Amino acid sequence: MXXXRKSHPLIKIINHSFIDLPTPSNISSWWNFGSLLGVCLGIQIITGLFLAMHYTADTSTAFSSVTHICRDVNYGWLIRYTHANGASMFFIFLYFHIGRGIYYGSYTFMETWNIGVLLLFTVMATAFMGYVLPWGQMSFWGATVITNLLSAIPYIGPTLVEWIWGGFSVDKATLTRFFAFHFILPFIITAMVMIHLLFLHETGSNNPSGINSDSDKIPFHPYYTIKDILGLMMMILILSMLILFSPDLLGDPDNYTPANPLSTPPHIKPEWYFLFAYAILRSIPNKLGGVMALVLSILILALFPVLHMSKQRSMTFRPASQCLLWILVANLIILTWIGGQPVEYPFITIGQLASISYFSIILILMPMTSLVENKLLKW
């Protein structure tokens, strides 16, 4: 019976992925976020499924169906707020996970990293379409503004936008297709996650030192299963506090007003986790330039393996690069703040400066610092 774990075709795969997986003995809590993201994805799919049972993807009833879920469905409010705040947790963990990858040089696993970048784009697309579904003011105007950006694409832009809308404005057809895509994409994400793990297990995990750890591996279970459970408990605690004490903390009050194409909200802004990219988009006065900067702000992650100039993999023993990375983090926080502010004098300038520094830190300062560090170490 004990042999079934290693011989059964299906259980064998699970065994090699989560039980007998050789893992570096020194990986820190920064390596917990992968499993937490998996749990978040599971929570989102389950709560989303239950929401879909009561939601109607029609402009005339979408808003009231969400109200019905919160008021009349047993624990509907809990399912709805778990789904909404679960998305926020998902993005917090995603950004931590990416930050960990940058700090410890995990991007040298090219295949794993590139699938990860694709995953980020897919998750962002899914979250954006999910935000449109409650059909509140910010849902409608957010969808209008963001889809309209595609009209900046030369020649095919305007046609492409109308094709996505399914008409001449964001309307019933748009809502229906967004619901369809929002439902299917998490399953595509799950498949991509499996590929992500497949590539990761080809090379094995990275570790804080950035050097090969083949000589010092321990089994994943029980050492890291118990460590992941601790992270899971902390996540559940934070998420529960968010849902039960201040479920609307991260939301926008405008989304409690039903969508009205005739009145524009004073400040159109996306959910908090897109604000940094939104600030970069707004900081460029030209439409096409803004869209390109928006896409590049995420796509730039794919350049990290190319921009890696250091002879060391990890930043553990590189104080100057560490300093730059933390400046980049501060810069992203500033961009997030600016993205939520109105387009007025001080904010415009701050946003432009933060956008310039975002790209220059990644493209110029970090590679140059790495080269200087190599010189200092006589490499």
From Swiss-Prot:
Residues that coordinate or bind heme b b566: H97, H196
Cofactor: heme b
Family matches, as Gene3D superfamilies: Cytochrome Bc1 Complex, Chain C
GO cellular component: mitochondrial inner membrane; respiratory chain complex III
Superkingdom of origin organism: Eukaryota
One Pfam family named in its UniProt record: Cytochrome_B
Additional notes on this entry: Heme 1 (or BL or b562) is low-potential and absorbs at about 562 nm, and heme 2 (or BH or b566) is high-potential and absorbs at about 566 nm.
Function: Component of the ubiquinol-cytochrome c reductase complex (complex III or cytochrome b-c1 complex) that is part of the mitochondrial respiratory chain. The b-c1 complex mediates electron transfer from ubiquinol to cytochrome c. Contributes to the generation of a proton gradient across the mitochondrial membrane that is then used for ATP synthesis.
Protein name, as recorded: Cytochrome b
Species of the source: Capromys pilorides
